[in-house]
């Protein structure tokens, strides 16, 4: 459903954000 879709999107954004914090460009 839409809830799981939003959860996946937030998870993906969190992963990317974390990666950006660890290895800033």
From Swiss-Prot:
Tell me which UniProt keywords the record has, alphabetically.
Amphibian defense peptide, Antimicrobial, Secreted
Q: Name one GO cellular component term.
A: extracellular region
Q: Where in the cell is it found?
A: Secreted
Q: Which domain of life is it from?
A: Eukaryota
Task: Give a brief account of the tissues where this protein occurs.
Answer: Expressed by the skin glands.
Primary location group? secreted
A single BP term in Gene Ontology: defense response
The family line of this record is:
Belongs to the gastrin/cholecystokinin family. Magainin subfamily.
Q: What does this protein do?
A: Antimicrobial peptide.
Q: What is this protein called?
A: Xenoposin precursor fragment BM1
Q: Upper taxonomic classification of the species?
A: Eukaryota, Metazoa, Chordata, Craniata, Vertebrata
């Amino acid at each position: 459903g839409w809830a799981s879709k939003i959860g996946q999107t937030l998870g993906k954004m969190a992963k990317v954000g974390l990666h950006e914090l660890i290895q800033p460009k």
